[in-house]
Regions:
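Conserved acetyl-CoA-binding loop of GNAT-fold acetyltransferases
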Residues: 145-155
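Conserved acetyl-CoA-binding loop-helix of GNAT-fold acetyltransferases
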Residues: 105-119, 138-146
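Conserved G/P- and acidic residue-centered "switch" motifs that form tight phosphate/ATP-binding loops
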Residues: 75, 107, 137, 163
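Short, Lys/Arg-enriched C-terminal cap helix and immediately downstream tail that follows
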Residues: 128, 156-157
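Conserved GNAT acetyl-CoA-binding A-motif
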Residues: 123-132
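GNAT-family acyltransferases
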Residues: 1-102, 119, 123, 158, ...
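Short amphipathic helical patch at the helix-1/turn junction of helix-turn-helix
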Residues: 99, 134-135
Length: 182
């Protein structure tokens, strides 16, 4: 796997222990974690998260591989993205992206997801990539549409999430569709 990945404005690379404080700061922000399953309670928890995801072996299917999104100009951590291969079907992967509030709305999420799709389809040989999104997360819905993913399913009140039943939108993209667009 080719990590780090360089895009026009980002370096996508493994998270390290020294990134924990910055990751904790934006991941514990209510505007960010409103739609996140993981809400870190401490910097120590974030350090454990980094140790548990950044170095996950490729063969550990089902586990998330998480990477930091760093501004190329300053090496500042401004978000993270990740994927996990499905244990029951290794040709598929789920993706996710988080961008710190001060960097949202500037196309960084698009840039990161496009790079992640390239990695998964071109280098990892995935057949299908998908994302699970709360339909109330309108920014994520718009992002996945912009990068060429389509809504494959809308599950109504299918997830118990933060004290309520939430809907779940599944966005998907096949390798042949990706190759036709890129």
């Amino acid at each position: 796997m080719r990590i780090p990945i360089l895009t026009e404005r980002l370096t996508i690379r493994k998270l390290e222990r020294q990134d924990a404080e910055r990751l904790f700061r934006y991941r514990s922000n209510p505007s960010v974690n409103r739609f996140q399953f993981w809400e870190p309670a401490s910097i120590e928890e974030v350090q454990s998260f980094i140790e548990g995801t950044g170095g996950v072996a490729k063969e550990n299917f089902g586990a998330w591989r998480q990477f930091g999104l760093f501004l190329r100009a300053s090496d500042q951590l401004m978000g993270d993205c990740g994927y996990r291969s499905l244990a029951e079907d290794l040709s598929q992967a789920e993706i996710a992206v988080t961008v710190a509030p001060e960097f949202q709305g500037q196309g960084f999420g698009d840039e990161a997801v496009r790079a992640l799709l390239g990695l998964l389809f071109r280098e990892e040989g995935k057949r299908r990539v998908f994302a699970s999104v709360d339909p109330e997360n309108t920014a994520a819905v718009a992002l996945f549409k912009r990068v060429g993913m389509r809504v494959e399913a809308h599950f109504v009140e299918s997830l118990w999430f933060k004290g309520r039943w939430a809907d779940d939108l599944i966005f998907g993209l096949l390798a042949r569709e990706y190759k036709g667009k890129n």
